[in-house]
Amino acid sequence: ESRGLGDVYKRQVIYIDDSDVVKPDGYKFEALGLVRDGSKSTASKTVYEKGYHVTEACVLTKNNHPVSIFSKIHSSKEKNFTSNNDVTFSAMERGAALFGKATFAMDRGYDDNKMFLKLDELQQDYVIRLTAKRKLFFHGKWVPATQLRNQRKGKIKTTLTYKGQKHEACLSHVKVQITASKKDIYLVLVYGITEHPMMLATNKKIKSKEDVVNIALTYFSRWRIEEYFRCKKQMFQFENFRVRKLAAINALNFYITLCMAFLAHMSMKSETHALKAAIMQKADPIKEKVQFSYYRLAKGISGILSYAKEGIRLWFRTKRPSYRQLCLKLTA
């Protein structure tokens, strides 16, 4: 199975991220908890609303479009709930089972010793952005990662895309150790993009400048999973469900995931493919080419299906009832 997936997906990089489903006016939903509302929160202010956590793991297709391999809506109010980490571990185990060995790209929210230890246990590679609180073992003592960051300057110049804009960045790296097990890793530093240089921890081997650049590119391609969440919420009205049971909510999420997978399938088709050409014609996009085509594909499919007033029942052959004529068996 993993061999077949390797043929479809561009690189065996798995992106894990958390999102939220907010139901501020909900009262009857099962196990409704409090979540951080990402649309209202800022760097200086955190807003909490009633809702659910969503943990998603995605991979990229050959044309750089995300496909989900794990998606779960969960809440700390559930009876058998243990921790958010356990849900994340399930996503990691799913990725390891599908691909054998992959690279996990994760944001600062996953800078946790438990995450590093779990990935080491599964024998997986990772690229995880570190927080300012992280301490690393360097030259026989524990030092703040920010201290190592401030002592260095980027020597490797490259162009990186961040939040839709291209930036000239400088990269540097240093060999350090992490967690109580003191595993050897590399700290990759990215200067020139954010106010404070980014700190990326990776256990991937670095033998050349190209390896350093590839590690940075792996992390910065994370924006596609964030766009995946936005597309789910906008095109499928993800937060507008009415079912109350958590199992039913996850069932709806599963069907949306299938729809998103179909969009990924169509995005890989040639521009001359008859169905894709019809979808694009109906979508009537303003821009000829975009990096993320799910929106226009979903719009085109929605436009085509808007003509289907009778549903799908007319596509099936009608079963005619058997003749109800009275039959008499004649005997000689």
Residue ranges and their predicted role:
Residues 291-332:
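Charge-biased C-terminal accessory regions appended to nucleic-acid-, cytoskeletal NTPase
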Residues 214-242:
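Short amphipathic alpha-helical "interface-anchor" segments enriched in bulky aromatics
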Residues 13-21, 57, 103-111, 126, ...:
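Short, conserved catalytic/metal-binding motifs centered on acidic residues
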Residues 72-189, 275-286, 311-314, 325-332:
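An internal, acidic/charged active-site-proximal segment
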Residues 241-270, 283-285:
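Basic, amphipathic alpha-helical segments enriched in Lys/Arg and hydrophobic/aromatic residues
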Residues 1-9:
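Single conserved hydrophobic/aromatic residue that forms the stacking wall/gate
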Residues 197-222:
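Extended, non-catalytic structural segments that build the interaction scaffolds
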Residues 38-101, 185-199, 203:
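Electropositive, glycine- and tryptophan-enriched low-complexity nucleic-acid-binding patches
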